[in-house]
Amino acid sequence: MKSLYSATSNEAAKNANVSQAEFEKRYQESIENPDEFWGREGKRIDWFKPYTKVKNTSFKRGEVSIKWFEDGELNVAYNCIDRHLAKSANKVAYYCEGDKESDEKVAITYQTLHDEVGRLANLLKRQGVKKGDRVAIYMPMIPQAVYAMLACARIGAIHSVIFGGFSAHAIADRLNDCEVKLVITADEGRRAGNTIPLKHNVDMALDNNACPTVENVIVYRYTEKDVPWFEGRDLDWAVEVENESTECPAERMNAEDPLFILYTSGSTGKPKGVVHTTGGYLVYASLTHELVFDLKPDDVYWCAADVGWITGHSYMVYGPLANGTTSILFEGVPTYPDSGRIGRVVDKFDVTILYTAPTAIRALMAKGDEATRSSKRDSLRVLGSVGEPINPEAWSWYYSEIGNSSCPIVDTWWQTETGGMMMTPRIVQGDVKPGSCTGPLYGVQPALVDAQGVLQEEQGVLVEGGLVITDSWPGQARTVYGDHERFEQTYFSTFDGMYFTGDGASRDADGHYWITGRMDDVLNVSGHRLGTAEIESALVAHPSVAEAAIVGFPHDIKGQGIYVYVSAIAGVIPDEELTKSLKLFVRQEIGPIATPDLIQWTSKGLPKTRSGKIMRRILRKIAANEHDQLGDTSTLADPSVVDDLIENRLNV
């Protein structure tokens, strides 16, 4: 595909920190001599005890072990706050933009960040939270969410941030899996003019001692909603920290001590608690944030992600703060009160870098010039995309309308498990192709394999396959909490000696990579990964459902929508009310983000092989309205089931 613009003639590229030639030289070194390359890059952050070992990793089946800088000691909160204070105490760390445009403009300096984190860290210690204890954070997109993460990091507690859209049931699952000692939440959150009952959801999750390891709940009174209070368990944030000191010593952490657990959907139904550790993660988040966005000291950077997802962790909190950046913390959504909001926020704070998801871009694009007519956006110099592949139409609109045809787009590919960006075009490349994540960053060795694990190494032609990474990088997840066997089984058992991403991809004749979608049973809805098994488990728990199967289908706004095939139990006649009830049931069990878009009731059941396996490939084709491309159906136990599904399909 011909590029839409030549990045090398772009103003941002002319002033780039790292030229393309220099990048290629450093990349080669990172592959050929990783110890020397990362040994040097590791010094971008401060260490209490310098490391002498750099890379000690194995992808060998049954022996998977990932260690970086393993004898070094440091503290993440110290690196994100304290080391900046001598020169930048009064620099703004976050400009906070509330859900309502009329909300007061709030600026949080690095000194304020230090003081608030110190107070909360001391409160956590007073409540008996120690190094290695797990703390869950279920908060709105407000500064206190960041304070909570950094307070945990300061004392060596392991935080697990739970997305504010998850239900009580989903919260309880996560609290129990990692045996959380303390929960930090707020009375309510705000989103698009509505309130989110955060404290209520936590109370429901803890009801009847459902999470026995939880001892206390710290509640930030944000909206001042009158919420139920459990004496002896619940603590008022503001009251409790009032007399705490702003000084809290930073715990010395080994580079391989866990920093956080973040749950990501798996194909088995039970969410995986992905563990990221301290040293390698911070080095990688800091480096990739600076490199990809070509960071300058006076940039105002806006990552429009939620703190409950990995993008919020790496590129709204840890990467930017480690680099001493000024960021935007946005509570709202891009389309509230109208689709011009995102541009007005850019103008209000003179944002120079915008990092958002294709879902948001498509939602704005659908509104036409409403998204751009109330703003100029002339402060922008770099645009970024994250969460899912961006289709060329949305890419072109983002470039021409939001970026005024003057900003390079870094279309990044990475995952919760990778910790940071892995592949992206660079702003100094001249042959940018809309929709392509192009090529790897330092230390990343991508490859394509066929079903037998044979590397597809042919160059100069289009090749397709499963996307694997053939060697380790510092930001890589180390394990699944409490289940290293699952970690190995999920990521390293499919192809021995390689990390399997679960994504399919192609590499074109120019060597550029294109992500084609998930190869496992995980959906990517609005840039958020949802396990089909988890949703299916919720559906079959409904008293009227006998069997259910979930697939994704192309959705103009979300990228992928959720298409549900359901069989009712005997005696139940499906109708519109039951369909509504089922959608509500899923919302309550998992959260609004998992709400099905389309529910098709099946009168003849689901298509299965003679061995009883559901043929999801067929369900995907029908949901995508590609029923004329079903392929081989010879193993179907009852072909008439497929005819019935096609005749009654909903996505027409």
UniProtKB/Swiss-Prot annotation:
A cellular-component GO term for this protein: cytosol
Keyword Ligase in annotation: yes
Residues annotated to bind Mg(2+): 540, 542, 545
SUPFAM superfamilies: Acetyl-CoA synthetase-like
Binding residue positions for ATP: 387-389, 411-416, 503, 518, 529
UniProt binding sites for CoA: 191-194, 311, 526, 587
Signal peptide location: none
Biological process, per Gene Ontology: acetyl-CoA biosynthetic process from acetate
Coiled-coil portions: none
Modified positions (N6-acetyllysine) in chain numbering: 613
Keywords from the named record: Acetylation, ATP-binding, Ligase, Magnesium, Metal-binding, Nucleotide-binding
Pfam families named in the record: ACAS_N (PF16177), AMP-binding (PF00501), AMP-binding_C (PF13193)
NCBIfam families: Ac_CoA_lig_AcsA (TIGR02188), PRK00174.1 (NF001208)
Similarity remark: Belongs to the ATP-dependent AMP-binding enzyme family.
Name assigned to this protein: Acetyl-coenzyme A synthetase
Annotated organism of origin: Marinomonas sp. (strain MWYL1)
Upper classification of the organism: Bacteria, Pseudomonadati, Pseudomonadota, Gammaproteobacteria, Oceanospirillales
Gene, per the UniProt record: acsA
